Each structure stands twice: as structure tokens, then as C-alpha cells.
């Protein structure tokens, strides 16, 4: 018996630990499925040994004690939880138990709803006015969150309509839609705030702020699903009727509610909701199935912690626990280096998961993750599996630190992480196999070297057949080799070779743009070319030198400096020059000798032009001594606004910068 008592004590201690983390700290350490498994184990053991059941066992109550920082509210009608079923067989057994208890073979009518994944709350209305709101807490005592609930726009402060009871306590779920969850985390990443693991944690954390002004900024919403206190009024005698009455009084109710007259209809509803789950826009973890008749509900009654007339039919768990066996680093097509956790394979939501993205170094630090850790994995819908949190209380002794590579795992080039960015990137854009296709497609594009006839599909084949590894290899292609590609005849192949030969004559600005240096667009490339004049001068430039170019700040300057510091990039540039790529020598423009109102001014073009292309306008402006920048700043002298000018025009007006339209530009050109 001692061993049974020890098992019970251990299970209760473990469950209380997880209840505290879930209900009080809003930081669950294990997925719901693991908590449910432990609870089932405890309930089964207590059923076998009823003499060992204690009043404070987790099976005898709901949740954990409230935080001391909120005033406490005693629920006049306890807020109970629901028992769970996890498969069709268990639901059918529940259905039979209900019919047996009712001593009836008549078909039951079930009311089926979504099981929302948020925070259960009680809201008390007196004479139609919201007077108090509370969390479930331990089911008997909750926390007073009235001030915070009043900030949720979905919850009416005053009920509308007729026949409103003198005292009405509605119960429901406060939750956070997925778009709101993403918005909160995006803002937290930007400001260095707390990143939430999932919408449920974000909703709980938002609702239990001591400062209601913080809660008011969070896009929380609410669905009503039940009633507690009812005094001085009458409600319909069915569950669905009550939901419809709540809706008439202005309380939000889910539109996914359905009456089912058979167990088969309930199962069909369950599977349809499971299918629609990814497109709902908010998290659910199952469906709730209730006897629709209030009279039958009263006849069925309650057990210690749950009603006999309702059950939660939960979906396969979207979270599971496993171990991180290793971390590998993948390089994306833009050079982003992403850490990927190699996991002990585990079934999550019906899929065997063996890998999970770790996003970046900041995410690893936030998680406090080490190789060998026990972790919670989440897979929702089609989302790539990710690590939600580390189970630090079960950390093995032999875990290892995760070290980000100093060199690209594909090509060996240096990696960079610019201040203010979360992504670590490979700097070997011209040689890295992982970036090869995108780098080549950019190199031959119309605004770069403009190789006519060299489309994306040709580049794909050239890379896949390993005919081309760097941009310099393009200029060694023969018509004979190109003829071996799909849909490439001798004439088309020769045309591509001719186009490559023609592309060797370019401009310094186009060449710089074609190199694909991160953050260097056409305008920045033109500015760099105009400022430094020669490739030799640009390659020698320091980060401080680079920031003297209009529209080049510390981030762009760092990217440019790191690009030319990488030896492999300089090697490819050397080979391109050996293949005959060239451009005219720089023309030194003496601004003082140019008779133009644009000479010496930093100009920004925005909007669309009708009389000439943006490229032609830029070329004209540079030729008459202007510096053309890509964004508006205090250094900008003039903005030329075409049709549908947007944020750049607004910023110019805000900074008091002179603005002219296309017609005035042409007049100043002398046209």
C-alpha cells in the first residue's frame, strides 16, 4: 500500500506543480495532453483505491489558487471543469452512460460547440449593468478582473433588450485571435518585450495585467457559453435557447453551434470542425458536447469536479514532449541561416515530427535551449513544427550549448548579423550553393545586367545540371551547351550567347546592383557608383566612408563592407572582369559648372511618371549634377512627386522639404 500512496502523492504533487504554472504563472511547462494523461492516471488509481482519495486532490477541484495581487471573488455557483474524451469509442461510451443514467432509450439531443482555448471567466450583470468579472481560479474562488474585462470591446457593459434578469452571471471564454497574437509578438520582438508561446498564454497574460491600460491595447475577444447565477428572471429551458437569448441581450456567442440528434451526428460535427480548424482564425482544442435539455441536465447532475451532462471531445494533441538530439543550420535562398532542431521522433497532431525550426539565435536565447533538453513541440495546421518551451525541471546533466557557426555551413564564407536584425546571413552571395539560383536570376534581370532571353527556367536548369556555379560561369557558356537544355533550340541558344556578350557592356551602377549586395537597390547602387567612381575605390571604403553616400546608413554600409571583405566575392568579381565585363570610365561632374537648378541637390523620386520612365528621370538628374536617393531624410533637398505618391511625399511634407510635380520637373529640364 505504501507504493500506491507514494504514486498518488507523486502524481498529485506533479499535477499541482503544472496547475500552478498554467493557472497562476501563465507559463505552462508541459502540453495539455501530458497534463490530461497524468490526470487520467491519478483518477484511475483513485478509482481503484477510493479510501485514499483526499479532499485536496487535483481530481476534486479545478485549477489553482489565485494570485494574491488581485482581490479574490468567491463563486456563488462553482465554476466546474469538464471531463474529456479523446476518441470515438470513449464518446460513445459517454453517450451510453448518459442514456443509462436517464433510464431511457430515447434519442438524446446534444448541443455541440467549439472548445475555445483561452481563459474561462465569469461576468456578473445586475439589472443589465456589468458589475463584476472574475477568473475561474480553483473553481470556488477566482480573481477579480473587472477593470480588465471592461476594456474588452466584445463584452457589453450594459445588456440590451427586454426581460433582463435582476442578477445574471454569464460564463464564457476570453481568447486572442491568431492575428492579434501575431501582432502582439511582432511588437514584442520590435521592443524587446515578452514573446508568448501561444495565443492562450497571451490571452491569460493580457487579461491578468494589474494595469488595465495594458489589457486595453490587446485585441482580446469573448464568447459566452453558460450561466451561473440567475435571480429575478427566466431563461429558456434548453442550452441552445439560452445561447440565443444571450445573443439577443448583446452577448457574443460563437456561430459554430449545432444541435445533433444522434451520436453519429455529433461525430460528424466533430470531424467537420477538426477539418475547418486551421481556417477559424482562433485556437480551439476540441468540441464541447452538452445535453440540450436543462431538465435532463438537472436530472443527470454533477460529479466532484464536472457535470455528468457534458463532455469535452478533444482533438489529437498539437503539442507533445520530446528531446532535442542535435541542432543543424540550414541556409536559405537569401542567405539566411536558420537553426533546425533534430528531435527524437514524436507524433504531433497525427504527424510524425523529427525536426522543428528554431528561427534564429534570439529565439534560442529566449527559450534557454540546449542540445539534449526535453522540450514541448507544437504543430498547428500546416505550420512548421516549432519548439514552444523547454522543460527545465527535467533537464538532463549532459546538455550542450548551441553555438551558431562563424562560417556558412554550405560555402564556408563568413556570416554576418547586423545590429538591429535578428537574422544571421551568409556573406558569400556569389558562390554559395544555397543562394545560387536566386543570385543568378537577379544578376541577369532587366534592371541588372539585362540578359535578354535568360529566364528563370533556364537558370534553374543551368544550376541543376551544374553548368553554372557563379555569375562568371554564365559568360563561358557556349551555344552547344545551351542547346542541351529543355526547349532550347540552336537559334535560341545562340541568341542567349549573343545577349550575354552584349551584357558585358554595362554601367558601374548596374554592375553593383547585379551583385545582389543585401539592401543595395538601384538607387543605392547609383549613389555608390557616383560617389566612389571606381570599383577599386569602393572596395577600399570603410564603413565610415560608405556612410558619406546619400541614403546609406550603418546597416547598408555594413552589408556593403562585409560583401567586399569576403574573399570569395572578390574572386568572382575578378573573374567577371576577366570575362570582359566593363563600363565607361567615370565622368567627373563639376557641379559648379553645371547650369541647372538640380545641380548639387539630393533628390528623391516618388510615384509614377507619365512622360518618361523613372530610370530615364534618374539618368537625366544624375547627368545634370543631382544625387538621386531612394528615401526621404533630413538630407533630402527636393522631392519629385508623380501620380499616386505615398509615404515618401507625406514624409517630405512632414519635414518641410520642397516638393514639385512631374510637369515642373520637365520645365526645369528645359522641355
Swiss-Prot record:
<feature type="binding site">
    <location>
        <begin position="81"/>
        <end position="82"/>
    </location>
    <ligand>
        <name>NAD(+)</name>
    </ligand>
</feature>
<keyword id="KW-0235">DNA replication</keyword>
<dbReference type="GO" id="GO:0003677">
    <property type="term" value="F:DNA binding"/>
</dbReference>
<feature type="domain" description="BRCT">
    <location>
        <begin position="593"/>
        <end position="671"/>
    </location>
</feature>
<dbReference type="InterPro" id="IPR001679">
    <property type="entry name" value="DNA_ligase"/>
</dbReference>
<feature type="binding site">
    <location>
        <position position="426"/>
    </location>
    <ligand>
        <name>Zn(2+)</name>
    </ligand>
</feature>
<keyword id="KW-0460">Magnesium</keyword>
<dbReference type="Pfam" id="PF14520">
    <property type="entry name" value="HHH_5"/>
</dbReference>
<keyword id="KW-0234">DNA repair</keyword>
<dbReference type="Pfam" id="PF00533">
    <property type="entry name" value="BRCT"/>
</dbReference>
<feature type="binding site">
    <location>
        <begin position="32"/>
        <end position="36"/>
    </location>
    <ligand>
        <name>NAD(+)</name>
    </ligand>
</feature>
<dbReference type="Pfam" id="PF03119">
    <property type="entry name" value="DNA_ligase_ZBD"/>
</dbReference>
<dbReference type="InterPro" id="IPR033136">
    <property type="entry name" value="DNA_ligase_CS"/>
</dbReference>
<dbReference type="GO" id="GO:0003911">
    <property type="term" value="F:DNA ligase (NAD+) activity"/>
</dbReference>
<dbReference type="GO" id="GO:0006281">
    <property type="term" value="P:DNA repair"/>
</dbReference>
<dbReference type="GO" id="GO:0046872">
    <property type="term" value="F:metal ion binding"/>
</dbReference>
<keyword id="KW-0862">Zinc</keyword>
<keyword id="KW-0464">Manganese</keyword>
<keyword id="KW-0436">Ligase</keyword>
<dbReference type="Pfam" id="PF03120">
    <property type="entry name" value="DNA_ligase_OB"/>
</dbReference>
<keyword id="KW-0520">NAD</keyword>
<dbReference type="InterPro" id="IPR012340">
    <property type="entry name" value="NA-bd_OB-fold"/>
</dbReference>
<dbReference type="InterPro" id="IPR010994">
    <property type="entry name" value="RuvA_2-like"/>
</dbReference>
<feature type="binding site">
    <location>
        <position position="113"/>
    </location>
    <ligand>
        <name>NAD(+)</name>
    </ligand>
</feature>
<dbReference type="InterPro" id="IPR018239">
    <property type="entry name" value="DNA_ligase_AS"/>
</dbReference>
<feature type="binding site">
    <location>
        <position position="411"/>
    </location>
    <ligand>
        <name>Zn(2+)</name>
    </ligand>
</feature>
<dbReference type="Pfam" id="PF22745">
    <property type="entry name" value="Nlig-Ia"/>
</dbReference>
<feature type="binding site">
    <location>
        <position position="432"/>
    </location>
    <ligand>
        <name>Zn(2+)</name>
    </ligand>
</feature>
<comment type="similarity">
    <text>Belongs to the NAD-dependent DNA ligase family. LigA subfamily.</text>
</comment>
<dbReference type="Pfam" id="PF12826">
    <property type="entry name" value="HHH_2"/>
</dbReference>
<dbReference type="InterPro" id="IPR041663">
    <property type="entry name" value="DisA/LigA_HHH"/>
</dbReference>
<dbReference type="InterPro" id="IPR003583">
    <property type="entry name" value="Hlx-hairpin-Hlx_DNA-bd_motif"/>
</dbReference>
<feature type="binding site">
    <location>
        <position position="290"/>
    </location>
    <ligand>
        <name>NAD(+)</name>
    </ligand>
</feature>
<dbReference type="GO" id="GO:0006260">
    <property type="term" value="P:DNA replication"/>
</dbReference>
<dbReference type="Pfam" id="PF01653">
    <property type="entry name" value="DNA_ligase_aden"/>
</dbReference>
<protein>
    <recommendedName>
        <fullName>DNA ligase</fullName>
        <ecNumber>6.5.1.2</ecNumber>
    </recommendedName>
</protein>
<dbReference type="InterPro" id="IPR004150">
    <property type="entry name" value="NAD_DNA_ligase_OB"/>
</dbReference>
<feature type="binding site">
    <location>
        <position position="408"/>
    </location>
    <ligand>
        <name>Zn(2+)</name>
    </ligand>
</feature>
<keyword id="KW-0227">DNA damage</keyword>
<feature type="binding site">
    <location>
        <position position="314"/>
    </location>
    <ligand>
        <name>NAD(+)</name>
    </ligand>
</feature>
<dbReference type="GO" id="GO:0005829">
    <property type="term" value="C:cytosol"/>
</dbReference>
<feature type="binding site">
    <location>
        <position position="173"/>
    </location>
    <ligand>
        <name>NAD(+)</name>
    </ligand>
</feature>
Amino acid at each position: 500500500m505504501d507504493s500506491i500512496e507514494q504514486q498518488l502523492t507523486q502524481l498529485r504533487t506533479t499535477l499541482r506543480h503544472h496547475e500552478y504554472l498554467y493557472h497562476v504563472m501563465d507559463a505552462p511547462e508541459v502540453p495539455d495532453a501530458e497534463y490530461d494523461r497524468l490526470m487520467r492516471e491519478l483518477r484511475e488509481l483513485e478509482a481503484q483505491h477510493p479510501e485514499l482519495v483526499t479532499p485536496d486532490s487535483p481530481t476534486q477541484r479545478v485549477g489553482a489558487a489565485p494570485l494574491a495581487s488581485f482581490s479574490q471573488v468567491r463563486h456563488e455557483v462553482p465554476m466546474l471543469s469538464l471531463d474529456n474524451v479523446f476518441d470515438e469509442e470513449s464518446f460513445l461510451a459517454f453517450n451510453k452512460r448518459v442514456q443509462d443514467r436517464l433510464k431511457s432509450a430515447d434519442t438524446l439531443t446534444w448541443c455541440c460547440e467549439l472548445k475555445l482555448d483561452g481563459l474561462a471567466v465569469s461576468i456578473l450583470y445586475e439589472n443589465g449593468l456589468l458589475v463584476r468579472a472574475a477568473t475561474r481560479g480553483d473553481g470556488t474562488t477566482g480573481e477579480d478582473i473587472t477593470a480588465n474585462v471592461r476594456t474588452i470591446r466584445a463584452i457589453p457593459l450594459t445588456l440590451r433588450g427586454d426581460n433582463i434578469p435582476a442578477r445574471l452571471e454569464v460564463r464564457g471564454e476570453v481568447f486572442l485571435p491568431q492575428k492579434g497574437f501575431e501582432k502582439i509578438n511582432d511588437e514584442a520582438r520590435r521592443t524587446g518585450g515578452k514573446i508568448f508561446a501561444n495565443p492562450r498564454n497571451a490571452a491569460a497574460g493580457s487579461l491578468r495585467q494589474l494595469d488595465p491600460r495594458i489589457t486595453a491595447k490587446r485585441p482580446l475577444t469573448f464568447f459566452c457559453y453558460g450561466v451561473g447565477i440567475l435571480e429575478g428572471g427566466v431563461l429558456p429551458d434548453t442550452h441552445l435557447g439560452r445561447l440565443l437569448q444571450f445573443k439577443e441581450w448583446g452577448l457574443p456567442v460563437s456561430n459554430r453551434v449545432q444541435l445533433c440528434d444522434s451520436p453519429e451526428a455529433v461525430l460528424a460535427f466533430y470531424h467537420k470542425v477538426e477539418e475547418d480548424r486551421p481556417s477559424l482564425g482562433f485556437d480551439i482544442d476540441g468540441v464541447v458536447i452538452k445535453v440540450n435539455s436543462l431538465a435532463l441536465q438537472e436530472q443527470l447532475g454533477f460529479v466532484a469536479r464536472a457535470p455528468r451532462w457534458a463532455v469535452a471531445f478533444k482533438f489529437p494533441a498539437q503539442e507533445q514532449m520530446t528531446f532535442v538530439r542535435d541542432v543543424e543550420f540550414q541556409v536559405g535562398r537569401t542567405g539566411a541561416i536558420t537553426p533546425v532542431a533534430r528531435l527524437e521522433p514524436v507524433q504531433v497532431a497525427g504527424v510524425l515530427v523529427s525536426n522543428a525550426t528554431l528561427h534564429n539565435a534570439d529565439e534560442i536565447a529566449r527559450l534557454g535551449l540546449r542540445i539534449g533538453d526535453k522540450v514541448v513541440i507544437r504543430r498547428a495546421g500546416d505550420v512548421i513544427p516549432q519548439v514552444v518551451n523547454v522543460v527545465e525541471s527535467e533537464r538532463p546533466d549532459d546538455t550542450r550549448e548551441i553555438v551558431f557557426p562563424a562560417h556558412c555551413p554550405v560555402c564556408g564564407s563568413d556570416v554576418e548579423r547586423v545590429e538591429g536584425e535578428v537574422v544571421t546571413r551568409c556573406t558569400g552571395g556569389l558562390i554559395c550553393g544555397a543562394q545560387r539560383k536566386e543570385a543568378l536570376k537577379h544578376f541577369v534581370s532587366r534592371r541588372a545586367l539585362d540578359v535578354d532571353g535568360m529566364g528563370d527556367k533556364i537558370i534553374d536548369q543551368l544550376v541543376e545540371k551544374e553548368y553554372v556555379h557563379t555569375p562568371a560561369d554564365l559568360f563561358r557558356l557556349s551555344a552547344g551547351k545551351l542547346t542541351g537544355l529543355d526547349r532550347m533550340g540552336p537559334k535560341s541558344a545562340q541568341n542567349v550567347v549573343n545577349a550575354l556578350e552584349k551584357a558585358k557592356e554595362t554601367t558601374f551602377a548596374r554592375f553593383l546592383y547585379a551583385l545582389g549586395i543585401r539592401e543595395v537597390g538601384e538607387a543605392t547602387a547609383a549613389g555608390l557608383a557616383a560617389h566612389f567612381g571606381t570599383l577599386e575605390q569602393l572596395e577600399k571604403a570603410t564603413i565610415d566612408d560608405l556612410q558619406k553616400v546619400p541614403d546609406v546608413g550603418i546597416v547598408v554600409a555594413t552589408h556593403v563592407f562585409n560583401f567586399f571583405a569576403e574573399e570569395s566575392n572578390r574572386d568572382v568579381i575578378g573573374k567577371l572582369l576577366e570575362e570582359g565585363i566593363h563600363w565607361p570610365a567615370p565622368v567627373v561632374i563639376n557641379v559648379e559648372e553645371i547650369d541647372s537648378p538640380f545641380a548639387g541637390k539630393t533628390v528623391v523620386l516618388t510615384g509614377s511618371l507619365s512622360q518618361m520612365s523613372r530610370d530615364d528621370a534618374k539618368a537625366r538628374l544624375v547627368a545634370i549634377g543631382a544625387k538621386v536617393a531612394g528615401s526621404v531624410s533630413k538630407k533630402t533637398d527636393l522631392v519629385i512627386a508623380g501620380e499616386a505618391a505615398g509615404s515618401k511625399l507625406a514624409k517630405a511634407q512632414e519635414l518641410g522639404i520642397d516638393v514639385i510635380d512631374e510637369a515642373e520637373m520637365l520645365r526645369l529640364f528645359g522641355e
